[in-house]
């Protein structure tokens, strides 16, 4: 088997509207008789979990980083500096929008995100059984650390729900969960708040993979995002051959709502380390309700 063959079995993404929101069929209305209505239900737009999760996030440091990258990109491109000097920003809005975009591109601001997206897919392929030697050499250390690190923990990947689209119907929010993990033995988890949680064999938890250089700026949004995933009301099985773009499924069984595992493997590091962090989803859910 080669990576090319594996790529063909990647799960399709759900249909989206013009704002990038997932198109998902909501549950049928319940009639006074207590039975579900048989009326045809059209797909509706569900806000992405990542969008909601970032609502309360302090973006100051991220915005400053973006500004620094634009300044750096301008320093690399004489033509952009000339364009800026030759136009008035109040009268030439589109020109300056293009200058900012091109300066950001020159600074390779999307490089880390692209590498992270690719690494997510490589992890999925590795979990499907793809041999380490078939991956690009520069990502093999990342995949090795991921596989070795996860193998030492008392979890099994719930493969049928890898990259699973979920829906939180009451709030019209949806997202894609990287992994659901099932406990192979009982463990005790101590959160940063000091709260102790006992997990039983067979319990399932959300596993969220992050590949950014640092987690410093995103703890709140990551916890909210995982809380949305853990509290989902239904799964959405994407099928572009279906008239509605997919079919609804049941909530993932035995899933805990109080704790999730964050799996961090930085994509831009040549010798990465795998770090695991437990997330307090009760706090994340409270923050989600505030954001809504």
Indicate residue ranges for each PLM-predicted region.
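Mg2+/Mn2+-dependent nuclease catalytic core
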Residues: 160-291
């Amino acid at each position: 088997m080669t990576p090319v063959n594996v790529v063909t079995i990647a799960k399709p993404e759900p249909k989206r509207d013009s704002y990038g929101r997932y198109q998902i069929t909501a549950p049928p209305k319940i009639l006074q008789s207590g039975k579900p209505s048989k009326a045809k239900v059209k797909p509706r737009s569900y806000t992405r979990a990542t969008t909601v999760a970032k609502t309360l996030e302090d973006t100051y440091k991220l915005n400053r980083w973006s500004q620094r990258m634009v300044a750096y990109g301008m320093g690399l491109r004489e033509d952009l500096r000339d364009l800026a000097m030759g136009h008035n920003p109040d009268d030439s809005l589109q020109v300056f929008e293009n200058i900012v975009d091109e300066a950001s591109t020159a600074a390779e601001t999307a490089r880390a995100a692209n590498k992270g997206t690719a690494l997510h897919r490589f992890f999925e392929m590795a979990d499907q059984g793809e041999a380490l030697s078939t991956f690009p050499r520069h990502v093999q250390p990342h995949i090795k650390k991921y596989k070795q690190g996860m193998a030492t923990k008392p979890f099994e990947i719930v493969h049928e729900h890898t990259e699973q689209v979920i829906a939180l119907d009451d709030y019209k929010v949806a997202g894609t969960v990287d992994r659901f993990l099932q406990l192979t033995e009982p463990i005790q988890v101590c959160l940063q708040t000091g709260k102790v949680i006992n997990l039983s064999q067979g319990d399932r938890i959300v596993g969220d993979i992050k590949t950014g250089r640092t987690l410093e700026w995103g703890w709140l949004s990551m916890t909210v995002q995982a809380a949305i995933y853990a509290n989902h009301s239904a799964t959405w099985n994407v099928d572009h051959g279906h008239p509605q773009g997919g079919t609804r499924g049941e909530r993932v069984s035995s899933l805990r709502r109080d704790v999730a595992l964050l799996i961090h493997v930085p994509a831009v590091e040549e010798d990465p380390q795998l770090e695991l962090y437990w997330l307090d989803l009760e706090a994340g859910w409270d923050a989600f309700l505030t954001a809504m």
